[in-house]
């Protein structure tokens, strides 16, 4: 019956929208590289020693605990406190375990063993009872206060030691990183208790799903504090994102705000981290061996030899993090590296005058210095590029200042080099170094190993090539191509007009090589100059390689840099690069960045259909099918223009002042614009997806009611349609009071769920009664509903009354179907707090704070009355016309204020439901 109310064109549209949504979801959940993280292993059995907390503290936080990680002999030795190492505190995230510390703890222990425990780290971990803090924000403040107490407890464990620490380093995974940042907002917290903060896959900008006001209030408090106190915050902070493999927390949310006064913060995607170069999912980021090795190396380089603790020098801390996480020159970190190096010893000096040079070193018996005079090359070329496949940490490239072909001392240019997976390379613009006379490449004596060194001089215009990307709406039907015929080692393709998050492309690189015996490796690198989100692809030539191009962070308005596609190639190969729009990945970006707003658009569509049903009941006396009204009423032009106009007017000072006087919250569209998340036509696209979801959810709820009614009839004897309509049955006040007491004493979401189940039961019972009645009547397909009404005037009065009741029951079921759709979304949005309450029931019987309690007090009696409401009882209501007018502005309000604040949706939904219930009395 539900499907019969939709024409074939609309049905085809809904199926097509499902297809588009499937493409977008597939790109988000499956359209990324395979997991290239190596598993980190424990070489000894891991042990978690529980740290005894003060009794008052343990009583105040019965669900929380503090542990010290250890293995083997280290664990045995440190069971007897106090400790002697450097304290690091690990904070797990949403549903995270304190045992997630074992990967980095084990690697740090092995590193300490390698240096005979000259320095070592003590890794502590907090047990938050695997709380779902990403879904329920009421415990975030409690976690923050507990961590503060843990820090003080940890520092007491080192009392009396010669090099006792005065602060701890913190590693926060997921929401644990946000809790760590929130420590600074506590009144009694001393900022110098934290010397370093590293967060992994932490959504710093905004919550992934703002399901209650406690989460958004917590974010507002933390971010506002960091912005307003940026000048005084001296905490070195590193945020590492997982990249596209992490579909739970998109990387754009992990980037710390770039503040003019707070320069001690870095944000990077794991695919851009040197010696890591892989994307991680939300869980593997804590055990990915490549990333944990990088983190541990950074920790050991941060140690101050004098204090045997992490350095207090902010500049050094930032330099270490930059060295390991942003740009690695393939050298061990040095705080003050020597710029001038001695080039002495018994070495051979070879003069090279050609512009392109390759040297294959194998079993070299003596050191060789190859010198390249720069004077003549400056006249012809603009840049010099050198690379080496020997990935040791020794200096390998220098420059002479004197004019001779040999120099006793040279400028060490190795610090300006950069490490890639298979090479280390250096690119210099010659005009930036006018005082240099010679370039010197050093080849050490090697035994049993082989490596290749290449150098070439080139003109910028020959290697920096502009490649405009294809238009967004080309849908992959057109492409742009560049053919690289020169035998260069390095190319820079400037991807013009590529800077928005809604853009997505596929680049295909075809390499064709001349006959070579050895395997040739090429590296393709997407470099984003406005954020550290580079990604690398290694390809063997000859080959055809397809690479995805999409962004985590949009290009800032005042940034004029261009995204680059860097190619580290072979001179024996020719390359052909083709770029075209990827429609499926564009849909993926829509889902990735705006999928969380979909519930708001679904509810907006249902409200519009609900309005149509109420108005048809007022104007014609009958309620039309939900699907029919959805098709008729759910139009984007009824909602979007109002939001666009309000956003436009907010640009004027007088309107903004009026807006603030009315105490209205900030428009969600303005928030999205500030986060550079506004797609062209994004609201229209989401509205259409919302219409599709509203249709299929309506179909599902209608089918579920029919199925449940069939089961009811199979289990219970048939029931009759009610002849006496009673809005308030004798048991209704008692049931309402009981549910309100449940809400007050336990959890508001539980009471809402029970009320919802009661409402569904009443609807199922009505459906079963109607089915029983229809089965007991003779079938006459020739008569329509109107003809039945007309003919019934000539029949027995009792039968006339029953037929009217049957028609009214059908109308009531249509209305109830829409109300169930609305209530279902309220229940779904309240479920996180219910799940949290059930998980912590052994510690707390009453959820406090409870985001659903105020809503439950209003919704429980409303649902109780609506469950006993029939359309015949409200047709003549004076309030019906007013009630039918409310859903339209509320549908606009849902989009304006609920797309980025999902917890506001129930507030917009219960208003028309409450008015609907009041129609029974007015």
Swiss-Prot record:
Glycosylation, residue list: 402, 558
Tell me the superkingdom of the source. Eukaryota
Lumenal topology: which positions?
33-641, 690-733, 839-853, 915-922
Q: One Pfam family name from the record?
A: PGAP1_3rd
Catalytic residues as annotated in Swiss-Prot or TrEMBL: 174
* EC number(s) on file: 3.1.-.-
Q: What class of enzyme is it?
A: hydrolase
Q: Name one GO biological process term.
A: attachment of GPI anchor to protein
* Ranges of Basic residues composition bias in the record: 782-793
Spell out which residues lie on the membrane's Cytoplasmic side: 1-11, 663-668, 755-817, 875-893
The membrane topology noted for this protein in its Swiss-Prot or TrEMBL record is: Multi-pass membrane protein
Q: Which disease is it linked to?
A: Neurodevelopmental disorder with dysmorphic features, spasticity, and brain abnormalities: An autosomal recessive disorder characterized by severely delayed global development, with hypotonia, impaired intellectual development, and poor or absent speech. Most patients have spasticity with limb hypertonia and brisk tendon reflexes. Additional features include non-specific dysmorphic facial features, structural brain abnormalities, and cortical visual impairment.
What job does this protein perform? GPI inositol-deacylase that catalyzes the remove of the acyl chain linked to the 2-OH position of inositol ring from the GPI-anchored protein (GPI-AP) in the endoplasmic reticulum. Initiates the post-attachment remodeling phase of GPI-AP biogenesis and participates in endoplasmic reticulum (ER)-to-Golgi transport of GPI-anchored protein.
Q: What is this protein called?
A: GPI inositol-deacylase
- The organism of origin for this protein: Homo sapiens (Human)
């Amino acid at each position: 019956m539900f499907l019969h109310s939709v024409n074939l064109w609309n049905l085809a549209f809904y199926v097509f929208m499902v297809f588009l949504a499937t493409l977008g979801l597939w790109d988000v959940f499956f359209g990324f590289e395979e997991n290239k993280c190596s598993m980190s292993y424990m070489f000894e059995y891991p042990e978690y020693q529980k740290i005894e907390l003060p009794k008052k503290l343990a009583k105040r936080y019965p669900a929380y605990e503090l542990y010290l990680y250890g293995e083997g002999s280290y664990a045995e030795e440190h069971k007897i406190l106090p400790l002697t190492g450097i304290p690091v505190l690990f904070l797990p995230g949403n549903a995270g375990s304190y045992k997630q510390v074992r990967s980095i703890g084990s690697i740090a222990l092995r590193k300490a063993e390698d240096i005979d425990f000259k320095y070592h780290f003590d890794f502590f971990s907090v047990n938050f009872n695997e709380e779902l803090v990403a879904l329920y924000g009421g415990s975030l403040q409690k976690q923050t206060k507990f961590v503060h107490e843990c820090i003080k407890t940890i520092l007491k464990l080192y009392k009396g030691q010669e090099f006792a620490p005065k602060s701890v380093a913190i590693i926060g995974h997921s929401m644990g990183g946000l809790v760590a940042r929130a420590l600074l907002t506590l009144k009694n917290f001393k900022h110098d208790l934290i010397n370093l903060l590293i967060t992994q896959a932490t959504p710093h900008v905004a919550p992934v799903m703002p399901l209650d006001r406690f989460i958004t209030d917590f974010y507002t408090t933390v971010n506002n504090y960091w912005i307003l106190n940026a000048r005084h915050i001296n905490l070195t902070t590193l945020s590492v994102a997982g990249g596209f493999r992490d579909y739970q927390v998109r990387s754009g949310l992990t980037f710390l705000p770039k503040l003019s006064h707070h320069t001690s913060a870095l944000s990077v995607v794991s695919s851009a981290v040197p010696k890591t170069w892989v994307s991680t999912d939300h869980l593997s980021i804590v055990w990915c061996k490549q990333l944990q090795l990088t983190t541990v190396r950074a920790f050991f380089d941060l140690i101050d030899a004098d204090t045997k603790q992490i350095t207090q020098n902010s500049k050094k801390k930032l330099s270490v993090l930059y060295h390991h996480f942003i740009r690695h020159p393939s050298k061990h970190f040095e705080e003050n590296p020597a710029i001038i190096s001695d080039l002495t010893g018994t070495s051979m000096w070879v003069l090279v005058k050609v512009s392109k040079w390759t040297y294959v070193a194998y079993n070299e018996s003596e050191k060789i210095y190859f010198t390249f005079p720069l004077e003549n090359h400056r006249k012809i070329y603009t840049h010099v590029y050198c690379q080496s496949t020997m990935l040791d940490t020794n200096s390998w490239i220098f420059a002479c200042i004197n004019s001779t072909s040999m120099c006793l001392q040279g400028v060490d240019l190795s610090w300006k080099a950069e490490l890639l997976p298979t090479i280390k390379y250096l690119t210099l613009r010659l005009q930036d170094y006018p005082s240099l006379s010679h370039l010197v490449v050093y080849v050490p004596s090697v035994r049993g190993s082989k490596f290749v060194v290449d150098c070439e001089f080139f003109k910028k215009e020959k290697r920096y090539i502009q490649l405009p990307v294809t238009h967004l709406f080309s849908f992959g039907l057109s492409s742009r191509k560049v053919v690289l015929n020169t035998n260069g080692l390095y190319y820079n393709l400037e991807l013009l007009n590529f800077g928005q998050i809604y853009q997505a492309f596929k680049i295909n690189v075809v390499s064709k090589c001349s006959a070579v015996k050895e395997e040739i490796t090429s590296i393709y690198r997407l470099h984003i100059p406005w954020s550290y989100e580079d990604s690398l692809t290694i390809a063997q030539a000859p080959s055809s390689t397809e690479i995805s191009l999409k962004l985590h962070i949009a290009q800032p308005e005042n940034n004029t840099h261009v995204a680059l596609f860097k190619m580290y190639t072979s001179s024996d190969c020719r390359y052909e690069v083709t770029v075209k729009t990827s429609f499926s990945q564009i849909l993926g970006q829509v889902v990735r960045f705006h999928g969380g707003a979909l519930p708001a658009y679904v509810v907006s569509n249902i409200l519009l259909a609900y309005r149509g049903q109420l108005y048809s009941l007022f104007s014609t006396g009958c309620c039309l099918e939900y699907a029919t009204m959805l098709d008729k009423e759910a139009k984007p032009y009824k909602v979007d223009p109002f939001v666009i106009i309000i956003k436009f007017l907010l640009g004027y000072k007088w309107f903004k002042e009026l807006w603030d006087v009315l105490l209205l919250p900030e428009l969600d569209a303005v928030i999205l614009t500030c986060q550079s998340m506004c797609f062209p036509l994004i609201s229209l696209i989401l509205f259409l997806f919302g219409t599709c979801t509203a249709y299929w959810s309506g179909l599902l709820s209608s089918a579920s009611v029919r199925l449940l009614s069939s089961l009811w009839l199979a289990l219970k004897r048939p029931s009759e349609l009610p002849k006496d309509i009673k809005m308030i049955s004798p048991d209704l006040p008692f049931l309402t009071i009981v549910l309100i007491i449940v809400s007050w004493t336990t959890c508001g979401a539980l009471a809402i769920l029970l009320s919802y189940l009661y409402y569904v039961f009443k609807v199922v019972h009505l459906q079963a009664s109607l089915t029983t009645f229809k089965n007991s009547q003779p079938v006459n397909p020739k008569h329509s509903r109107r003809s039945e009404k007309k003919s019934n005037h000539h029949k027995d009065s009792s039968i006339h009354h029953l037929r009217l009741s049957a028609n009214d029951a059908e109308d009531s079921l249509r209305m109830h179907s829409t109300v169930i759709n609305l209530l279902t979304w309220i229940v779904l949005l309240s479920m996180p707090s219910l799940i949290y309450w059930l998980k912590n029931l052994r510690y707390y019987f009453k959820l406090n704070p409870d985001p659903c309690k105020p809503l439950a007090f209003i919704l429980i009696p409303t649902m109780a009355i609506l469950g006993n409401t029939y359309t015949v009882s409200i047709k003549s209501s004076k309030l019906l016309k007013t009630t039918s007018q409310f859903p339209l502005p509320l549908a606009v309000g849902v989009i304006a204020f609920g797309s980025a604040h999902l917890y506001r949706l129930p507030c917009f939904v219960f208003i028309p439901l409450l008015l609907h219930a009041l129609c029974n009395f007015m």
